[in-house]
Design a protein with these regions (language model features):
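Conserved structural elements of the adenylate-forming
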Residues: 84, 88-89, 210, 243-264, ...
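Structural core segment of the AMP-binding/adenylate-forming
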Residues: 2-20, 127-210, 600-602
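Conserved AMP-binding A3 loop
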Residues: 77-81, 228-254
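Conserved ATP-binding/catalytic segment of the ANL
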Residues: 452-517
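Conserved ATP-dependent adenylate/AMP-binding module captured primarily in the ANL superfamily
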Residues: 139-170, 253-272, 286, 302-317
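Gly/Ser/Thr-rich phosphate-binding loop
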Residues: 200-203, 316-319, 328-430, 443
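Conserved pre-ATP/AMP-binding loop-to-beta segment of ANL
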Residues: 63, 182, 202-203, 210-232, ...
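Conserved AMP-binding/adenylate-forming
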Residues: 72-80, 91-139
Length: 667
């Protein structure tokens, strides 16, 4: 059913200035709760499985899960009742594996891209007291093995022969793994069965369902404090940490969401599932859509053809990350950059639409038909709400998105450890560059960060700390990291530095030397620097990145003699390509200005990153050679000989900005 675009102001423009509940400690809450208790319960719902079960009882014949086998094919749908049949068959089938009933670990790995089988397997686990452990490729092979061993995964559901082969190849180093359930055809399974031998049993998902149907059992979910998911972080600080998410956490975040969006999102809505289900954000979104009884259509599995999925599904709610919205923005401006008239027309149309949007009026206009219709068609033409998370979104991109889609764009902030939003802008927030007020399920305060000389009460800046039922209790089998995450008063320390800007929360930094890229991936620069410093060409290196860029960059202080030798062995294509003559004795400044020297060092970084099996997003894509070494005297090194990152970032701010502006250096 089509949900018409409103031609008047949306009805969820709540006051969004945080309410200061405790002035002495600086504790702020949502203006929706003020002095009332936090919103963390739902009437008639105790656990996540209740959400699904209640919707099945309320609207059994309504469509729930959709998919299409080819890009040109229309979506096919399973009803809530049909999905429930498969969920109970799946859960009953999983209980036929004795490892899940006799061993202490009740964890099941899900190693797949978003698909109906992923959601059915997850619900099947929750219905029968099993714990879901998502796995994903960007973790890297070593991290994958660590998770499988720490969670003692005896059963893993995976979606492709390639992923199944990865597991089989590593089976000797993952002794708990006994069964792989595959979401592909039986014909593709035979070669893998031969490779697995007797070590690992392999069956198809349909065979699992058949076993469950033959041995159907009554659902037996865990209680409110029962563990439902262990979501591992991407391991940027070393070994991945498993966030323990229980029923109580997810119910609290859904309760808070219902308080904010309950009058706007309905059972008539449709969402495209393409952001990774291995991350908590997409799981949270789909649980809430399940709560209201809406539809979830899965993408075809290829991120490059998501636009085809969108056109065919025609979703009403679009979940995104800033990088994708920036790509839309860049593509539009790239297409019109050669035409002065088109640039003028677009700017004028955006100005006119923004006048309407600023008044919270989201109706179709002349400019939609004339200018924005082609963009809207790429998204199916029905989007009426855009939800963005993962990294900050630039204000021009935010205004552009609001105008083009002619709908509210809500920018949220949260992390795995908070199971979803900590705060969010609302439809009436027009300025951007902030993430709104606290979610109704949490309290927020800023605390001092001594290492950064930040005093929250003095600077209106400090570490963002969160407290509420939606916050996890700790990391799986990791009491040391848990103690660092949650203090004695129950405050969860996010590691992000924030400030209250015009009444709204703004994320401005990281407490530790970790940063997030535009696509939402975290980077630990010291990990990269440790590898790159193995090069004889490098004396010192400083790796940096920010949330508006998709790649890290670096400042490099070169080793003079090895780099001179490399230059002398280099044969430029033309005498003028290198500004350093091989026979001369150039200064370090001359070497750093030489484009050939830069190419040589970049090639070295590429070689080292490949040897270390860096992920694509971890590889430095642009560098600047600098002649002044980092030292204690110039404040670029700490007394313990560590790089003073804030000082280096401040000293080379202009150079770093230029590295992001330049195209990544070809490698």
């Amino acid at each position: 059913m089509f949900i018409p675009r409103p031609s008047h102001a949306i009805d969820f423009f709540y006051e969004n200035a945080p309410y200061l509940r405790n002035e002495q400690e600086g504790i702020r809450v949502s203006p929706l709760v003020k002095d009332e208790p936090l919103v963390n319960t739902i009437e008639g719902v105790k656990i996540v499985y209740d959400i699904f079960r209640n919707t099945v009882r309320r609207q059994p014949n309504d469509p729930f899960i959709g998919w299409h086998d080819t890009l040109s094919a229309p979506y096919e749908w399973m009803t809530y009742d049909e999905v429930n049949e498969k969920v109970e068959a799946c859960g009953s089938g999983l209980l036929q594996f004795e490892e899940l009933t006799e061993n202490s670990s009740k964890c099941v790995g899900l190693y797949a891209t978003n698909c109906p089988g992923w959601l059915i397997a997850e619900l099947g686990c929750w219905a029968y007291g099993l714990v879901v452990v998502p796995l994903y490729d960007t973790l890297g092979q070593e991290a994958l093995k660590h998770i499988c061993n720490e969670a003692e995964l005896s059963v893993i559901v995976c979606d492709t022969p390639e992923r199944a082969k990865k597991l089989i190849d590593e089976r000797r180093s993952m002794p708990h793994l006994k069964h792989i359930v595959v979401l592909f055809s039986k014909e593709e399974l035979e070669d893998l069965r031969s490779a697995a031998g007797s070590d690992v049993g392999m069956i198809t998902f349909n065979e699992l369902l058949a076993r469950g149907n033959a041995n159907r059992q009554k659902p037996c979910p865990l209680d409110e404090d029962g563990l439902v998911t262990i979501c591992y972080t991407s391991g940027t600080t070393g070994t991945p940490k498993g966030a323990m998410i229980c029923n109580r956490n997810l119910i609290a975040i859904i309760a808070g969401t219902q308080r904010v969006l309950g009058k706007f999102i309905t059972k008539e809505d449709t969402i495209l599932s393409f952001l990774p289900l291995a991350h908590i954000y997409e799981q949270y979104c789909e649980i809430y859509l399940m709560y209201v009884g809406a539809r979830i259509g899965f993408y075809s599995g290829n991120i490059t053809t998501v636009s085809e999925d969108l056109r065919m599904l025609r979703p009403t709610i679009f979940t995104s990350v800033p990088r994708l919205l920036c790509r839309i923005y860049d593509n539009v401006y790239e297409r019109i950059c050669k035409s002065t008239f088109k640039q003028f027309l677009l700017k004028f149309a955006l100005k006119e639409k923004c006048h309407q949007v600023d008044k919270q009026i989201y109706n179709k206009s002349f400019w939609d038909s004339m200018i924005f219709s082609k963009i809207l068609r790429n998204f199916g033409g029905r989007v009426r709400l855009v939800l963005v998370t993962g990294a900050p979104i630039a204000p021009p991109v935010l205004r552009f998105t609001r105008a083009v889609f002619s709908c509210p764009v809500l920018e949220g902030y949260g992390c795995t450890e908070t199971c979803g939003p900590v705060s969010s802008s609302l439809a009436g927030d027009l300025k951007g560059s902030h993430v709104g007020a606290p979610w109704p399920s949490v309290e927020i305060k800023l605390t001092d960060v001594p290492d950064m000389d930040l005093v929250a009460s003095r600077d209106n800046r400090g570490e963002i700390c969160v407290r509420g039922d939606s916050c996890i209790s700790g990391y799986y089998k990791n009491p040391e990291k848990t103690a660092k995450l949650i203090d004695e008063d129950g405050w969860l320390h996010t590691g992000d530095v924030g400030t209250w800007h015009e009444g709204c929360l703004k994320v401005v930094d990281r407490c530790k030397n970790i940063f997030k890229l535009a696509q939402g991936e975290y980077i630990a620069p010291e990990k990269l620097e440790l590898v790159y410093q193995q090069s004889a060409l490098i004396n010192q290196i400083f790796v940096d990145g920010d949330a508006h860029s998709t790649f890290p960059v670096a400042l490099v202080v070169p080793e003079v003699e090895p780099l001179l030798k490399a230059l002398s062995n280099h044969s430029p294509k033309s005498p003028r390509e290198s500004i350093v003559a091989p026979q001369s004795k150039p200064s370090l400044e001359d070497i750093c200005a030489d484009p050939i020297a830069k190419k040589i060092v970049m090639a070295e970084l590429k070689s080292l990153s490949e040897a270390a099996n860096f992920m694509g997003f971890e590889k430095v894509k642009n560098i600047k050679l600098i002649s002044e070494p980092f030292s204690i005297d110039n404040s670029m090194l700490t007394p313990t000989q560590k790089v003073a990152r804030p000082a280096v970032r401040k000293r080379y701010a202009e150079e770093l900005v230029n590295l992001y502006k330049e195209h990544p250096v070809a490698q």
